Amino acid sequence: MEVDTATFVRLHHELLCAHEGPSIISKFDAIKKVKLGTLANQSGGANNITEAFLAKLRNFERKSEAYLASDLAERELTRDTHKAIVFVTKSVLLGGKSLKDLLPYGVIVCAFIFIPETASVLDNVPVMIGNQKRPLTVALIKYIAKSLNCDLVGDSYDTFYYCNSSAYGKNLISVSDNDFSNPQRALLSVGDLCYQAARSLHVAAANYIRIFDRMPPGFQPSKHLFRIIGVLDMETLKTMVTSNIAREPGMFCHDNVKDVLHRIGVYSPNHHFSAVILWRGWASTYAYMFNQEQLNMLSGTSGLAGDFGKYKLTYGSTFDEGVIHVQYQFVTPEVVRKRNIYPDLSALKGGSS
């Protein structure tokens, strides 16, 4: 499926800068102005500027958006670059990795900037920067840094992108100031677009809706697959809310703030799924990037409403048995009209299994 790369990059740039612009500037500023050399072997401690920006980074660390080694003052600094900025998608952490796992070698102070999941579709579009092959996702990062007047490379820090694709030999890819020519058009596969849609829904379910914080009664990660349906438009969600609450009174809970329909009271591994979520990424990105024919293809039986729109992802849980396995599947208005998405739960009202 062909897409205009400038439109793709611009949309994701606007999304990220609108919601995270001040935070991004603050992270770059703190990394730039923290002088690690003032921490080591200084009887009077660090200077006031370094202490102030360390405090900012520690605040980001409490929100899981930065990493600082615990023994900074005792570290021997053997080279100039011990600080970094890392751009990454949040789904990388949901699979079980920690921020420490994403650190470039030798880095002891790092700030993390999270980009939209759908932006990583560009990971599979390679471009040449000098004699090195890089994912087109770096174009988005460079555009963000330039528009916010942030330097990607400083005298004591570097910027990296944690790329999920294995096509570039390593996950951590250095983002330099070097210019390169973006291709005007890029070919994206329907499968890649659907996979990133599922990851985007996964992040929304885990971080914003926080649906995994309280699992259904009787749920066991080792035995049960948690199923979530994603819908692309508000009207479809409203239809499902109205019909299911009317059909099974007392069996559903609708959160109209987070736009999610929960099933409550029972749980069975044989149920089709356990929640319905409005995927906002469709309206904010995909709906603008493609023409109507492409949108029909993407949302039809060969795309999100078919096998390409069904994925199993994991969430690192607090259960002793390990991670929660989650299956994501998308439905469109046509699918809802043709069949009832929820199974009949009448026989299960007496308890859970």
Curated annotation (Swiss-Prot):
InterPro entries: Phytoreo_Pns (IPR008777). GO terms for biological process: symbiont-mediated suppression of host innate immune response. The keyword Repressor does not apply. Keywords: Host-virus interaction, Inhibition of host innate immune response by virus, Suppressor of RNA silencing, Viral immunoevasion. It comes from the Viruses. The keyword Transport does not apply. Belongs to the phytoreovirus non-structural protein 10 family. Suppressor of RNA-mediated gene silencing, also known as post-transcriptional gene silencing (PTGS), a mechanism of plant viral defense that limits the accumulation of viral RNAs. This is Suppressor of RNA-mediated gene silencing. It comes from Rice dwarf virus (isolate O).
